[in-house]
Amino acid sequence: MRIAFVCTEKLPIPPVSGGAIQIYIEGVLPYLSKHHDITVLSLKNDNLPDEEVVDRVRYKRLSGRTKSEYLNNLRDNISNEYHLVHVFNRPLWVMPLNQQAPGSAFSLSLHNEMFLPNKIDRERALKCIATVKFITTVSRFIADGVKGLYPIAEEKLNVVYSGVNPSLYKPIWLEKHLPERKELRKKYGLDEYKVILFVGRLSQKKGPHVLVEAMKSVMETHPKTALMVIGSKWYGVNTTDIYTQQLQSMTESLKGPVVFTGFLPPAEIPKHFSIGDIFVCTSQWREPLARVHYEAMAAGLPIITTDRGGNAEVIRQGENGFVVKDFNRPEAIAERIRYLLDNKHIAKKLGMSGRKIAETEYNWERVANQLLELLTAYSGQAARGDRGRFFRLIRLNTPQRAVPGRGAALKP
């Protein structure tokens, strides 16, 4: 089947500047391209050719100084030659692209709350839902949000959790990885400290300021503790704004060392996870489900996260981490950090459990296989001219499984 992946206007593929959606796409392509002829339409980048074929995947990179320019270029590159057009995170684009290629089927991959009234009006939302053959979401939280606003969408919703490549991450408890861990920690002056790790964009909604506040009391009781902050204001750049400046100023009062790495290329992220002892995600917004949780699990780190959006769906309380209900209270975060610092055996057990979960449940092969089930079911029905039965086939033939930590049933 010939498939077009329509990527957002934000960042290019492959993820040379990072980005959760971009990493997701790169992760599944090696598996999907073995079964389907895939063209990836993404944003132009000075460091990448406008067109190329890599590992059976065709890439076409389009200019897009504005969202409208990018959409126009997408329309110029979409035609009925594709059996399926899979649109990432832009329900508003489904109808304009469908008008350009009325002979193609469409599907949608949701990574944010893109069906909220401030994102799309009701008329276009309903047209989008009616047009697409299926919708995948990265969390139950996102799926439930769509269903709550548009119950008619329920038959088309499929939760497909994201993934990670565990082989890129080096669990901190394995002896063979200790030399590289020690070398990196020494490079940053952290070799004598327990390192609390934050990875993500430096924005108020990601909550690093809450972690800094929490570290004030942690460092009072545990002076051999350090904070490492990996990330920048935006993907691929190291410019600052008022928030990042205030954040750095806040750390000046901390008694222990603090390291801001700035933006790191995606290829550098896995080894930097090995520097940490405890991973903390302090999201303050309705996070769809931050992919850093998968990365922390792969690195074998115990996780402390806030109960925001879909984050809790991949945390099994007391098994691979802890979910903090009081998401905006620094002391609630600090209490969990101190608990893990004081109970090293529990921290190690959580980290080892998380690594196992990442290996068995949150790898890219599992993500790709779930997508292949949807694609295969659709292509089979389409070939027989019976597309109307597609949704019932998916619901009847897809096994149920429980949401980690929640116990609710879902379609994978």
Task: Give the role of each language-model region.
Residues D241-F263:
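Nucleotide-activated donor-binding/catalytic signature segment of Leloir-type glycosyltransferases, i.e.
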Residues V87-W93, L110:
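Short His-centered aromatic/hydrophobic patch
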Residues A4-V6, T136, R185, L190-K206, ...:
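Conserved donor-binding/catalytic core segment of Leloir-type glycosyltransferases
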